[in-house]
Amino acid sequence: MAYHLWSELKASELAAAVTDATVALLPVGAIEQHGPHLPLCTDTTLAEGMALESAKRVRDATVLVLPTLSVAKSDEHLDFPGVLTLDAATLQAVILQIGKSVARSGLRRLVLLNAHGGNVPVLQVVARALRIEAGMFCVSAGWMSMGYPQGLVPESEIRDGIHGGFVETAAMLHFREDLVAMDLARDFVPQSRHVAENNQVLRLMGPVSAGWMVQDLNVDGAAGNAALATREAGQAMVEHAARRYALLIEEVSRHPLSFDAVEA
């Protein structure tokens, strides 16, 4: 069908685009350091880029792409310069109000496209709050959760390369190569790998997790092998994730809004 940028529509055009199946898509990024080789806008660039690439690939739904939420919860990066952050309660309140505003325009389906791990628990709480308080079907999913082309990303990077590593660096080479300093990229070995190798149960992240600051993972504020990244790998990852995310949006568009409909 079609996608539109919410902010570029006239009010009458937006009203005409809204049906029971229309999906609003909110990209959520961050402004925070990503090691010596990537810009502060990395997560915001990836969130916005992935939202547009995904929306373009949607075939069986109408998608309204909301303005990107650039400042989110980045307090694990506070010891580095340039970080802009909200606390969890503020971010939760902001997204809740955005969601309710979307609902007032007649939409009941919202997807939160996330590009920063620190936002995850807040977005999950908001998704349920919007179900309770606004009767919305809200889904939160990071673009990296869509997976990668078979064999492209090393298992060590999938597990530990969570910040400024191979995946994010390659994706940034695809979207904004001009902002990437590959001469400063290297293998930022994360402490989480050492912890996993030397403990049976304790982990820094995952189902068993600790409250860490980013320098607890690596003193340079990155985690993963950025030196492996290429623009070609980034393009392949982005295209794979965008296809999967477009499918998610289509499925959200078709999903019943009530349990009564599911049971029927």
Describe each model-derived feature in a short phrase.
Residues 1-109, 117-264:
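Extended, histidine- and acidic-residue-enriched regions that form the cofactor-binding/catalytic faces
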